[in-house]
Swiss-Prot record:
It catalyses: dUTP + H2O = dUMP + diphosphate + H(+). Belongs to the dUTPase family. Its EC number is 3.6.1.23. Pathway: Pyrimidine metabolism; dUMP biosynthesis; dUMP from dCTP (dUTP route): step 2/2. This is Deoxyuridine 5'-triphosphate nucleotidohydrolase. NCBIfam families: dut, PRK00601.1. Keywords: Hydrolase, Magnesium, Metal-binding, Nucleotide metabolism. It comes from Enterobacter sp. (strain 638). GO terms for biological process: dUMP biosynthetic process; dUTP catabolic process. Its cofactor is Mg(2+). GO terms for molecular function: dUTP diphosphatase activity; magnesium ion binding. The gene is dut. It is an enzyme of class 3 (hydrolase). This enzyme is involved in nucleotide metabolism: it produces dUMP, the immediate precursor of thymidine nucleotides and it decreases the intracellular concentration of dUTP so that uracil cannot be incorporated into DNA.
Length: 152
């Protein structure tokens, strides 16, 4: 059975002036989030700001969470990434989705009303249960890390 996520539209422009989030293709994992702005916002190099999406979600199911991720084109072409790098939306959060954007580029960038600024993906959640142990069963890799397995 497919799970449903409750989405509350906080701004009447969403679904009218600005499209609802949709999956671009049948294979898309992420929904595009749009800037729900009254007017364009100029983001100077090095600056951060919070951009409203006009949406609130309540995932409700503790086996799911949502993550907000940058859009690859904005980051690669313009240096616009998320100010917190990744946004995590816990299942019990019920507030508006705000996107922290950071201009890590060298030029000012203008975010227009309705512009796609980030994407949201729903992911399964597994909570760890900690068990205190004296050691682990031996593996070939052991404690090797940070380049231990080589480049090829």
């Amino acid at each position: 059975m497919m799970k449903k996520i409750d989405v509350k539209i906080l701004d009447p422009r969403v679904g009218q002036q600005f499209p609802l989030p949709t999956y671009a293709t049948s294979g898309s994992a992420g929904l595009d989030l749009r800037a729900c702005l009254d007017e364009a916002v100029a983001l100077a190099p090095g600056a951060t700001t919070l951009i409203p999406t006009g949406l609130a979600i309540h995932v409700a199911d503790p086996s799911l969470a949502a993550v907000i991720l940058p859009r690859s084109g904005l980051g690669h072409k313009h240096g616009i990434v998320l100010g917190n790098l990744v946004g995590l939306i816990d299942s019990d959060y019920q507030g508006q989705l705000m996107v922290s954007v950071w201009n890590r580029g060298q030029d000012s960038f203008t975010i227009e009303p309705g512009e796609r600024i980030a994407q949201m993906v729903f992911v399964p959640v597994v909570q760890a249960e900690f068990n205190l142990v004296d050691d682990f069963d031996a593996t070939d890799r052991g404690e090797g890390g940070f380049g231990h397995s080589g480049r090829k």
